[in-house]
A protein has these predicted regions:
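Bacterial Sec-dependent N-terminal signal peptides
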Residues: 1-29
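N-terminal, active-site-proximal structural segment of metallo-dependent hydrolase catalytic domains
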Residues: 19-87, 100-105, 180, 288
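Short, Asp-centered acidic motifs that coordinate Mg2+ and/or phosphate
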Residues: 31, 69-70, 160, 195-197, ...
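Acidic/histidine-rich helix-loop elements
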Residues: 35-57, 127-141, 168-171, 239, ...
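Active-site metal-binding loops of divalent metal-dependent hydrolases
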Residues: 36-38, 165-167, 201-202, 280
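Structured beta-strand-rich core segments of catalytic domains in phosphoester-bond hydrolases
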Residues: 70, 74-159, 163, 266-267
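Metal-dependent phosphoester-hydrolase catalytic domains
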Residues: 173, 177, 184-196, 203-288
Length: 288
């Protein structure tokens, strides 16, 4: 039996450990935030040579190299999320699956460095007209969720609110309404001065008006970071089969408020396999 009860306990019990390094005297600390659609694995041979079992060690290598402080994944089946959890012992984890609120379907799990953050609360809601129950929203093809956590940063003493999502790939109305709902919830939940990160696969390119309700309240890392990729490395790589023009498939985003974006990068390096997913991870480095 998987660790549903343990996951629930992690949402209410503080995680131990004190970060003793990572911040130079006189400097505010950086925080690295990553969004990564890991590509679902409903069965072992799914995607053939690109199946999860052929990619999973490379995924861990990428994460060990990048060292994100906060990580939000999309499309994670429980076997994938459990594997990441087992191989990333320095991280805490929360995430339930969208089809039953437990272990059926995909999860937008979030991970945080236990030496950096202490969990205060976490939960999940559905992108629908009835967000607090398992439900399908508007014209969406699939149930879609937002997984969120309120974390206390041990270095700064500040609260950090982290929201992670995956918008529908079919329903235009579902994508439009999803952004409005998320912003309404953020306004309802988060005190004015607290730091917010919103990551995910939005199934909408960076310049799509569907993202306007989010842009009205939160900045977008790719557009505002001091060091960035404005040429538009595509975050959706389609296993190398699509060859879209630069900037045509930038659909994974990091939105934020309350910090300064220093760097945005698409992690499309060599991790020992041709592709670690059909999406590249994106990571933002921020300064308080």
């Amino acid at each position: 039996m998987k660790r549903i009860l343990l996951i629930a306990l992690l949402c209410v019990l503080p995680l131990g450990g004190l970060l003793l390094s990572g911040c130079k005297s006189g400097h505010t600390p950086d925080i690295r935030v990553m969004s990564f659609n890991i590509r679902l694995s409903p069965q072992e041979d799914f995607d053939g040579d690109n199946c999860w079992n052929n990619r999973r060690e490379a995924v861990i290598r990428m994460l060990e190299s990048a060292k994100p402080d906060l990580l939000g994944i999309q499309e994670g089946y429980i076997v994938q999320v459990d594997y990441m959890d087992e191989n990333l012992p320095e991280y805490g984890r929360y995430g339930v699956c969208r089809d039953d609120g437990l272990e059926r379907g995909e999860a937008n799990a979030i991970f945080w460095r236990k030496d950096r953050f202490e969990m205060k609360q976490c939960n999940t809601y559905w992108l629908s007209e009835t967000p607090d129950t398992v439900s399908l929203g508007w014209d969406g093809a699939c149930r879609r969720i937002v997984t969120w956590a309120q974390l206390s940063d041990k270095l700064t003493g500040k609260d950090v609110w982290y929201f992670n999502t995956h918008f529908d790939h079919v329903g235009k109305v579902a994508r439009e309404e999803a952004g409005k709902l998320i912003i309404a919830r953020i306004k309802e939940q988060v005190p004015e001065g607290d730091v917010v990160f919103l990551t995910g696969d939005f199934n909408a390119n960076w310049d799509n008006p569907i993202l306007d309700p989010i842009r009205a309240e939160l900045a977008e890392c790719r557009e505002t970071a001091l060091i960035t990729d404005k040429e538009g490395i595509n975050t959706y790589n389609a296993w190398g089969e699509k060859n879209a023009p630069l900037g045509a498939d930038v659909i994974d985003h990091i939105f934020y408020r309350g910090v300064t974006a220093e760097r945005y990068e698409v992690l499309n390096g060599d991790y020992g396999v041709p592709f670690i997913s059909d999406h590249w991870p994106v990571m933002g480095t921020f300064r308080f």
